[in-house]
């Protein structure tokens, strides 16, 4: 007996070990998740959605398991029949244990599958359903609050489809069980007949819910003149669904009565009625649409088109747009420009795409440092608002030498990036490079507002794995010449590496080194989920996060700001987003309701509600109390850096191309469809991206930080309007549309691009530069509204066709009305346009040169030719050597010499005209 007892204990131990081996990693992952959520202060959030998933999964598992088990148990209660030699039929005695196992095993697997699927699909919908917030907007057909469609309809649909699917699976299990036990015999079909009727009754009762859901979903119909329910949908299809629902009730009754009375005729009455309604309804739909609606579509569909216009504008927040007339034909003077110095001083002369290349070439310092992207923002510097580009210097562990990518280096030593680079958008050096206001390692600056005192970046866009800090291995901080500075983490983030936690993380990360490394001690802490996007998505998986976070310098600290969105595809009558490249493809309601901040040093993560009108985010706030803070609770230093979401603005401007038309007749006939204005970038025609400008809105003296995007008529290039999103203080989020008078013609960006290409002097220079291994980049064309007029500004970059090239700003093109000039600086261009020596406090000079052709107005024809040849040879040599600063200087000299040649007379004392002409005709770069 003692042996048996010991054997039992051994078996129990083996069973425990087996469970740990199989489920240990999952248990460890759950435990480490809980530890992490507790560490960052969001344990209630984790427990809430974990419990919700478990509760939903358990409830569905129980329902599906019991339904499947008992129906299968019924299928096994009939004993199989066997014929003996005299054709006598006998029943094989049933084995109760065996039949229960036959019913139990498939039911158990189906229940587990149903519970898992339902927990994933339903937990969020159920929580929102229980805590739903009214939208205070009703649909124009049924008069239901929009919240019904956000919360109720989504839940009902999911439950309906899951119920139908699992009912069908249970039905198939019953068929298979019967045929397995009885074989394909007459008796098996007889036994299944009654059961089929019961399942049919269940299905037709489910179909009642399906028809009612179909009726509600008519508000998203896409087969009419517009998105949403149209004339045929509401006059024919909706009544058909209601009649079909009644027919389903009748069908269930006739099936049940027919079964009891064993009357096939009675049982068939309901199905025949249901099929008849659906057939007649389908014919009626086609008849009404083709013979009543289509011949007079605009008159029949007009009220529904109005519904579509109104609800689409509400769904995307476009109903809040303020429209302002903007003539755009005002006359600007130099005095006007000097009154608008805040605008002039913030005109963006450097483009973000070449700028990121320059940052990585000049400021990465080491191969393992990388600038991921460049973001634009504004800072108050010396009492004035200044636009800047800012980019974080992150550490990319994958760029370490392969031999250096050891476990110690990746997880204990190379733990963080360092600092950031800041450059004003309107200043360039004499080499055409961005002027650095914050640069180097450690970061240095002469601008007090941009001082960085905590430059370490433990949480960023490239921090994709955990690190363990405060170990016996000092952390690499930053390079200092031939040596490296070292540091120890002093922040609050991290989970203490106790022995138990070490074991959990070793199991979770499948790495024994975490448990056994002697470099990890009781003071060590593990930092998890350091990628800021992964971090916020793990905390709030129900939000959609912008993939372009931006960095803010906050009193010396570095803080990431991330836009978070709520969205739905259930806004009645609202057109859906058709751009497949959009993160909201297929949705028809989007709000940038939340701003998230993540401290780059300690990972502190906070969620702020910035749109209180959004019922979705208000419901999430009820579901997860303590997760969201109000906008008033956001620190002022962060709040003044909030920007209107470019992603949302792109969605809104794309929708507004058509939905600015409020008249249903104009909308139906597409009489006034707009397009996003086009521009040339490099050599490619593309839609203009939204861009930020500093300007005073008409009627206001205050300069604001605005996000704008111009519109043109579809298939035309003149500009008809521009939409602005305000960003500052109490005006944050307000949209203003500036419309040009229909009777006036304002140059659109594509027309200005064409004028630049057709200008003989400009095109000649661009063609000369765009040869022999060099490339001209025509940067973003900026449309700058100033007072009641428009300036168009396009920086010109020059670069080489190799990976180490540094793009340089070599010219600025400015267009105003019918005038267009190209100069080395914005000041020079404005001076040429407005006839005065205009000097802004803005951009620095691009490459300037001094050469004889500039100063000597009395050179002879032969001297001018010689200057051209000399400048050409020097420019060609500089291009071959990749010396683009000198190249720009000699190209300036070449331009001046060519201009000087035009002023001289070929009848001067030249005896080499033919030779000179031959040589000049062979000049190409």
Residue positions per predicted region:
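N-terminal membrane topogenic signal
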Residues: 2-13
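Soluble extracytoplasmic regions of secretory-pathway and membrane proteins
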Residues: 13-16, 22-881, 885-909, 913-925
